Curated annotation (Swiss-Prot):
GO MF: ATP binding; glutamate-tRNA ligase activity; tRNA binding
Protein name: Glutamate--tRNA ligase 1
Species of provenance: Helicobacter acinonychis (strain Sheeba)
Residues where ATP binds: K235
Keyword field: Aminoacyl-tRNA synthetase, ATP-binding, Cytoplasm, Ligase, Nucleotide-binding, Protein biosynthesis
Pfam family, one: Anticodon_2
Function: Catalyzes the attachment of glutamate to tRNA(Glu) in a two-step reaction: glutamate is first activated by ATP to form Glu-AMP and then transferred to the acceptor end of tRNA(Glu).
Subcellular compartments: Cytoplasm
Reaction(s) catalysed by this chain's protein: tRNA(Glu) + L-glutamate + ATP = L-glutamyl-tRNA(Glu) + AMP + diphosphate
Motif ('KMSKS' region): 232-236
Length: 439
């Protein structure tokens, strides 16, 4: 079984979605179940509703899961496993207070050495009023694993101390809950971000202590860097939020396409999730950081907009009039996102805002003259744009740019874009609706 294990503590990051996509693909390729595990044991950081938001995003991206679990529902199991380790003398109670440990950390900092917990501190503050934590005994050997992307990764004994499994309130730490649940659900492969590399030896030690004989294969994905700044894409970067990308009009299929592409060898530029199932391989992923380029994402999104079938295009653009399908196709040629497409359609159908495009009093006057001329015309009486244009020029006595710019503003709400002769058939059929001025 493969799993995606998000925490409901904020917006879904593109790095998390990338990991979800890869776990989903490999699960499908290997005909194994795909598990979603909501890691909600940190009650203080959980944000209400974020779990449902994560699940909704996964559905939008085309990923269906075979099983959904909440980590907090397994807390009794986590405590049972901690008790097992205590009984087998693989774990111990530690009474050292937070204050004492902070002092030792400060001392290590002043002495310019890494802080390392010492087992001899465990009973220093033992008394009936002091509630202990549970720690796993530090190993006296190195911990190594073969990463599917990073190859061999090794941690020496001095890099690992006796770390906490259960806090004072008997809640499990992240690493303990994660390791226990991966055993419980028989997870065979974990694909996740490289920020989890330091967690891996701890989780391996926990699973070994619990008697696991089926080592998990790990694949740690390199970080995603912003191509412009060269810095890691953090939660402060708008474009790192999947929710933000969706709100900006990026199609789910394009986001998936892009996240599979970066840092990867792909056989073609434009593809769907289902198509990627046929050729995706972890072996083709680079060990170097991936680079996020919003301009290229827009390019891919433009390609996927053009691939939309008629029904989906009408649905996403929220247009009910099928007669406007051709117009939508014309507008797509100059739009990179669904948001841009909706804005184009909105400018076309809604009352025209002369004030917004105001240049000077002369421009305002020309718009007024041309508007009155157009209102007197029956657009459907003209066989083509050329005959319509000649009559509009004659009635308004305007020509050149004094005619064409106001004409574009009055008819499509934009001084640039699709050529008027191409769009004229749609203007003819909707002229009474579009030839209106904003109050």
């Amino acid at each position: 079984m493969l799993r995606f294990a998000p925490s409901p503590t904020g917006d879904m990051h593109i790095g998390n979605l990338r990991a979800a996509i890869f776990n989903y693909i490999v699960a499908k390729q290997q005909h194994k179940p795909f598990l979603i595990r909501i890691e909600d044991t940190d009650k203080e950081r959980n944000i209400e509703g974020k779990d449902q938001e994560i699940l909704e995003i996964l559905k939008l991206m085309g990923m269906n899961w075979d099983k959904l679990v909440y980590q907090s529902h397994n807390i009794d199991y986590h405590r049972e496993m901690a008790e097992k380790l205590l009984k087998e003398n693989k774990a111990f109670y530690c009474y050292a207070s937070v204050g004492f440990l902070e002092q030792e950390k400060e001392k290590a900092k002043n002495e310019k050495r890494p802080f390392r917990y010492l087992d001899e501190w465990a009973a220093l503050e033992k008394n009936q009023h002091n509630t202990p934590v549970v720690r796993l005994k530090a190993p006296n050997h190195a911990v190594s694993f073969n990463d599917a992307i990073k190859k061999e990764v090794k941690f020496e004994p001095y890099e690992l101390d006796s770390f906490v499994l259960l806090r004072k309130d008997k809640s499990p730490t992240y690493n303990f809950a994660c390791a226990c649940d991966d055993l419980l659900y028989e997870i065979s492969l974990i694909i996740r971000g490289e920020d989890h590399v330091s967690n891996t030896p701890k989780q391996i030690l926990i699973q070994q202590a619990l008697g696991s004989n089926n080592p998990i294969i790990y694949a740690h994905l390199p970080i995603i860097l912003d191509e412009a700044s060269g810095k890691k894409m953090s939660k402060r970067d708008e474009a790192s939020s999947v929710k933000w990308l969706l709100n900006q009009g990026f199609l789910p299929v394009a986001i998936v396409n892009y996240l599979i592409t970066i840092g990867n060898k792909v056989p073609k530029e434009v593809f769907s999730l289902d198509e990627a199932l046929e050729w995706f391989s972890l072996e083709n992923l680079s060990n170097s950081p991936a680079h996020f380029n919003l301009k290229y994402l827009k390019h891919l999104n433009h390609q996927h907009l053009k691939r939309l079938d008629d029904e989906k295009l009408l649905e996403l653009s929220q247009i009910k009039d099928r007669n406007l399908l051709g117009l939508l196709r014309l507008f797509i040629e100059e739009c990179d996102t669904l948001l841009e497409l909706k804005e184009k359609i909105s400018l076309f159908l809604e009352p025209k805002d002369i004030v917004k495009t105001y240049e000077n009093e002369d421009f305002k006057e020309r718009c007024s003259i041309l508007f009155n001329a157009l209102k007197s015309m029956d657009f459907q009486a003209y066989k083509d744009f050329e005959s319509f244009k000649k009559e509009a020029m004659r009635l308004s006595q305007l020509k050149g740019k004094d005619f064409f710019k106001p004409l574009r503003i009055l008819l499509i709400g934009d001084s640039h874009g699709v050529e008027l002769p191409l769009i004229f058939p749609y203007i003819q059929s909707h002229y009474q609706e579009i030839l209106r001025l904003k109050a």
